[in-house]
Amino acid sequence: MSGTLEVVRPGPLTTVQDLGRPGHAHLGVPRSGAVDRDSLKLANRLVGNEEGAAALEATLSGPALRFEEATVVAVTGVVAPVSVDGEDLEVNAAIDVPAGAVLDVGTAAAGLRPYVAVRGGIASEPVLGSRSRDTLSALGPEPLAKGDRLAIGEPAGPRPAVAVAPVAPPGSDAVVRVTPGPRADWFGPDALKLLAGEAWTVSPESNRSGTRLDGTPLPRLRQDELRSEGMVEGAIQVRHSGLPMVLLADHPTTGGYPVIAVVVAEDLPKIAQARPGQEVRFRDA
């Protein structure tokens, strides 16, 4: 262990996340892990961690953290105010934090989920091979609370020479590529045209299990019920209401709603960072 951090302000649903625990779907346990894996990997690279090291994922507004020992951190995924002891700093950059200083990540102006990586990684106890919090199965460390103290691991390698990553900020709308789902025929031969023809709006009821979308309900050709079948991250289920939901990291491993399409894996970060009220459009890949 190379130090400890204290939670001064947890921020909304701030959890420890890494790249998840794949391979346990047969036990009913989803992969979990960071919803926006690209941002997690970038934050870890900036501080010299392995890409899959455990970091912190928040929702809309980030945490305030006091570090007992000097360290290096990076904040990615969003455009947000970041400061150390009141000094304004940048996102997508390596930040030196002196011993005893407080890192403060404010409310995001763009994007939804900030990621905070610490050199050495968060050294919480692994569960089924991962340090991630699974909000569906309640596995892994609890979401952060004021006064919590988290152990920081030993650095895995030298600090990178590149300290800044020129990353485009999250857009105000998201165009997401999809492929046909296994139950697209439940919506007729033009299922993807129906899906792509609507400007969907992200619902405030969205969470780490899935992004719910509001808009014009999709008509179903079949009204009978579907037996539960295996689900994957990025699957677009159509609920009884006719409204779609994109499954995310903490999704149930089975489900009975028909899957009209599946989001291309490379575009999942766009869904992960889409804020309530933001517009999402789908495009046939």
What residue ranges belong to the model's regions?
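Conserved "landmark" site that anchors the functional core of diverse proteins
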Residues: 1-285
